[in-house]
């Protein structure tokens, strides 16, 4: 069985959150590895990279059937949730994005019988897009 999630994010939304909340927002949403990868650049490229990873986290949550309401502080009360750090976008040896799951996100993937995940990221200066395909079986 295949599961799919897709998300589109306005880069300006992420830029606004970073400018308004600073490191508090960045540390709450992104792992140390993601921060190092995204913030290594300069200028608006940093916001584009952060937005693409936000989109990947949300697309993955959708593929897992938990959606945005199952992530972080936005989770519905009395329902299990995944923390933002539990869906991590890292790079493989060739620089391609790869998803790494932990905690409830990993448990949900196991419950669905997911054996592989693929993520694709794309962004412009205005929009970031992520698509996640999960294979079960």
From Swiss-Prot:
Keyword Cytoplasm: yes
Matches recorded under Gene3D superfamilies: 4'-phosphopantetheinyl transferase domain
Cofactor field: Mg(2+)
GO biological process terms, semicolon-separated: fatty acid biosynthetic process
EC number: 2.7.8.7
Listed SUPFAM superfamilies: 4'-phosphopantetheinyl transferase
GO molecular function annotation: holo-[acyl-carrier-protein] synthase activity; magnesium ion binding
Alphabetical keyword list: Cytoplasm, Fatty acid biosynthesis, Fatty acid metabolism, Lipid biosynthesis, Lipid metabolism, Magnesium, Metal-binding, Transferase
Pfam family, one: ACPS
Family: Belongs to the P-Pant transferase superfamily. AcpS family.
Binding site for Mg(2+): 7, 58
Predominant cellular place of this UniProt entry's protein: cytoplasm
InterPro entries registered for this protein in UniProt: 4-PPantetheinyl_Trfase_dom, 4-PPantetheinyl_Trfase_dom_sf, ACPS, Ppantetheine-prot_Trfase_dom
Name of the coding gene: acpS
Source domain of life: Bacteria
Enzyme class: transferase
Organism this protein belongs to: Chloroflexus aurantiacus (strain ATCC 29366 / DSM 635 / J-10-fl)
Compartments, record wording: Cytoplasm
Task performed by this protein: Transfers the 4'-phosphopantetheine moiety from coenzyme A to a Ser of acyl-carrier-protein.
RNA-binding keyword on record: no
Record's GO cellular component terms: cytoplasm
Catalytic activity: apo-[ACP] + CoA = holo-[ACP] + adenosine 3',5'-bisphosphate + H(+)
Protein name stated in the entry: Holo-[acyl-carrier-protein] synthase
């Amino acid at each position: 069985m295949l599961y799919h999630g897709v998300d589109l994010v306005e880069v300006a939304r992420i830029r606004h959150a970073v400018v308004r909340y600073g490191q508090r927002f960045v540390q709450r949403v992104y792992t140390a590895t993601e921060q190092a990868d995204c913030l290594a650049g300069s200028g608006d490229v940093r916001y584009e990279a952060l937005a693409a990873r936000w989109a990947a986290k949300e697309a993955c949550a959708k593929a897992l059937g938990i959606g945005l309401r199952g992530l972080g502080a936005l989770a519905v009360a009395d329902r299990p949730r995944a923390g933002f750090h539990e869906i991590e976008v890292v790079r493989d040896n060739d620089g391609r994005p790869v998803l790494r799951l932990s905690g409830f996100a990993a448990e949900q993937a196991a419950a669905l019988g997911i054996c592989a995940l693929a993520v694709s990221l794309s962004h412009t200066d205005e929009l970031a897009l992520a698509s996640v395909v999960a294979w079960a079986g």
